[in-house]
Amino acid sequence: MSSYFVNSTFPVSLPGGQESFLGQIPLYSSGYTDSLRHYPSATFGATNVQDKVYTSSYYQQAGGVFGRSGSTSACDYSTPNIYRTADRSCAIGSLEDSLVLTQDQCKTDCTEQGTERYFSTEDKPCTPVYPWMQRMNSCNGMPGSTGRRGRQTYTRFQTLELEKEFHFNRYLTRRRRIEISHALCLTERQIKIWFQNRRMKWKKENKAVNSAKVSDEEDGGKAG
């Protein structure tokens, strides 16, 4: 502060009638006066100081005034800090609000996507089911029924042809089974099952016949 203001020890009156020379002494440096040009009140005060002669008490008061202004400037410097902290708190609050909003938006988006997927699955048409994709019903030989498999019934023509084939061959090869299935409009499984049942029946008949022959032979031996 001493560089900007006249020293208080500087004599107010000069000997030898040199008081007129006092008004020519600049009270401020050139750099300080340049900075004061931006503030009209400060430059006005500077011109008044150059025109008039003041006592040391005035300089002290002026220094106090400027010191107060300096203190106010320090307070002014602290004021933006307060605003900065307030801005930071506001920014943090806005960030939290934005995070909450984004979470809510995410929840709503997820629910909307879920509903869209649900409705899309409902609106989607069913996959076409072709005859070869359906289960074969053994009751009538027609596809499309998924109930319990019933007993297969054969027509007289089918039964006659199968009996002829069984009379010549009790066991069928794969090629022969395919040929018969195409000729009688049956599946390979149906023909295979028919031959299995027919062989079981044939075995039972032969067993009964053999047991009857054995019993007859035993009776003839006892009688003889």
Curated annotation (Swiss-Prot):
Q: Which GO terms describe its biological process?
A: anterior/posterior pattern specification; regulation of transcription by RNA polymerase II
Q: Where in the cell is it found?
A: Nucleus
Tell me the SUPFAM superfamilies matching this sequence: Homeodomain-like
Q: What is the name of the protein in this document?
A: Homeobox protein Hox-B6b
A Gene Ontology molecular function term for this protein is: DNA-binding transcription factor activity, RNA polymerase II-specific
Record-linked Gene3D superfamilies? Homeodomain-like
Q: Which regions of the protein are recorded as binding DNA?
A: 147-206
Protein purpose: Sequence-specific transcription factor which is part of a developmental regulatory system that provides cells with specific positional identities on the anterior-posterior axis.
Per the Swiss-Prot or TrEMBL annotation, the motif Antp-type hexapeptide is positioned at 129-134
Q: What Gene Ontology terms describe where this protein resides (cellular component)?
A: nucleus
Q: Which keywords does this Swiss-Prot/TrEMBL entry list?
A: Developmental protein, DNA-binding, Homeobox, Nucleus, Transcription, Transcription regulation
- Please name the source species: Danio rerio
Instruction: Report the Pfam families cross-referenced here.
Output: Homeodomain (PF00046)
Its family remark reads: Belongs to the Antp homeobox family.
The reply to whether Phosphoprotein figures as a keyword in the UniProt entry is no
- Does the keyword Transcription feature in the UniProt annotation? yes
CDD domains, sorted: homeodomain
Per the record, the major location class is: nucleus
